[in-house]
Amino acid sequence: MAIRKEHLEFHPLDLALGWRTPAGYPSGIEEKILAGALDEKAKTGNRTRLLRFEAGARTSLPFVHDYWEEVYLLSGDLIVGDDGKATETYGPNTYACRPPGVHHGPFRSTDGCLLFEIHYYDPGSAGSAWRG
């Protein structure tokens, strides 16, 4: 199965418009979809998005999902593990690549942050389960 995304050449992004709170996220965290579509019910597709945390925004629980995730922190601070367990604080130019099934988070940001994320189901494996 091929990865399907619209062909987009360089174009300006309007960072003031087109943001929405993703399902299951608290207010203060918003996404802007740049390309693709991820269908979590059919376990197909991919998406590229920006995710931003306002200053003080936080999630309350760890995340786990059945698709690959790549995350690059463009600006600001991101604190991982804000659940009474060990925490790590990351700044710009940090990157994570997570296979399906990896627990991560919860997250918070003291000053706010902007993340570039790519999510995708592995088109080469049945059910997209990671076999690593």
Where do the protein language model's features map onto the residues?
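Conserved short histidine dyad/triad with adjacent acidic residue
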Residues: 31-65, 79, 87, 99-103
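A short, N-terminal "cap"/entry segment at the start of jelly-roll beta-barrel domains
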Residues: 1-45, 130-132
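Structured binding elements
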Residues: 71
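Active-site pocket scaffolds in enzymes
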Residues: 82
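Glycine-centered positions in the ABC transporter ATPase nucleotide-binding domain
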Residues: 75-76
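Ligand-binding loop in jelly-roll beta-barrel domains
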Residues: 100-125
